[in-house]
Amino acid sequence: MEYAHNKYIKKYEFGNPYDTGAVVACIDKTAGIPERFRFDAKTDTFFYTLKEKDMVFGLGETVRGINKRGWIYVSNNSDDPVHDENKTSLYASQNFLIVDNGKDVFGVFLDNPGSVTFDIGYTDANVLSIHPEYNDTSFYVIEGASPLEIIRTFRELIGKSYIPPMWAFGYGQSRWGYKTAGDIREVAAGYKELGIPLDMIYMDIDYMQDFKDFTINPERFPDFENFVKEMKTEGIHLVPIIDAGVKIEEGYDVYEEGKANGYFCKKENGEDLVAAVWPGKVHFPDFLNEEASRWFGEKYKVLTDAGIEGFWNDMNEPAIFYTEDHLKEVFAQVKEFEQKELDIWGFFDFKDVVGSIANNPEDYRRFYHEFHGQKVRHDRVHNLYGFYMTKSASESFEKICPDKKILMFSRASYTGMHRYGGVWTGDNCSRWSHLLMNIQMMPGLNMNGFLYSGADIGGFGGNTTEDLMMRWVEFGIFTPLFRNHSALGTREQELYRFDRKEDFRHLIELRYALIPYIYEEFIKAVEHNEMYMMPLSLYTGKMSAAVRSKTSYWQERH
């Protein structure tokens, strides 16, 4: 255990906090209510009176600007690809924020893995309220002379950030729709022909046999191990996706082993939860169960033995297309609607029923984990699921390939996962507003230790344009994770497909010229618990400039 400086941190406990793994330091508990805050025991809500010049920033991967004042943010990892500035929850939950008015500054970290609502001057312009759905909370107050000092102290509290291999700072091309080895060869050849550097090609779900984790479709990817070697001779690493759901199929080894050993999440009656994602019906591994976590992590060996050195974990909020139980309820309700005349209100009720199938909140209350010897309902620890899936893989890599650095990043996350992998910001869209969102998210992610991070360059959903892609690449040059990714059915957006091919080549060449500097600064930020990308206002200490400098960053350290 590392020991932080207690004079800078005070820890308050409410209810029965879970040992989430977010914190690596030992902090003595302080009795009472957090300084500066008022606590309403009836509603389990903490209140802070905002001063006129208070700015609030942090909360990691969230919408809107760097100054979070004026909106509601809910830490509740959600599979929501059609997100905009009106959303309250995205794929990640990182409950660290700083309040600063230029004279008084402090930080707050709420270690609570359930849903937490931060109302930052939305309901009442002068009040910051923090409401955990279940108040089993470790509440940390962090003091310091400046925001940067508070960030460094917080980062000491949560531990050093993940460092990927150096090649992971190169340019990566991805698309949901590369279905065969031939498709991937075509992409590699397209970049090679134009002399555009390329280090990674990502493999989405189509490489799998029937969307089953840790399988290869032998017809689409014959002799996979030699194909991996072939790509490496071209200087390209293949990076496959791994999803959270395990297909229910007799004879499928991952399913059979998980079922036989009780490694899947269970309902209250002890039966394995049946949900659905890409393969159809699936079980979810119980990553919070240490034995199940070790088992799943060992499965990555199938791919590392074939020469794979990088992965991205997806669908690990977990996303749920439906559960078997809820689908039965919906079908029963639909039958009732068949007997009714759907007036305006009946029609809206019908739409609500049908629209409630995917990612239904009740479904997240249907299953349980074995967590530190306790049976815990999922919704109380929901935000840990993606964290513990990535932890499972990372800890396994230390055993199955101890001499290699493995690229690992995830869609869902919680504070603490930054020690095991990076993040991408999920399924964005080809919109100028989403480029802006990418720019504005980076400081919050860095504050929470997620230094290896980035967005889908050009946008995942929708059809990008050449000018949007050009501007996004220009920004992406400076983000550690630099990946162009798009969805099935959208415009193909490999850089060689656009008219201004030479301009794109020059931009990617600039990125490669900067990699030694970027990597050095990244390592410094990890070692010194600093931000790799920080707003200029944080660097200068002039927080009043934060409103005017929403997209200006500083990356030099001494």
Question: Which positions does each model-derived feature cover?
Answer:
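Glycan-recognition and catalytic regions of carbohydrate-active enzymes
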Residues: 69, 73-80, 413, 495-558
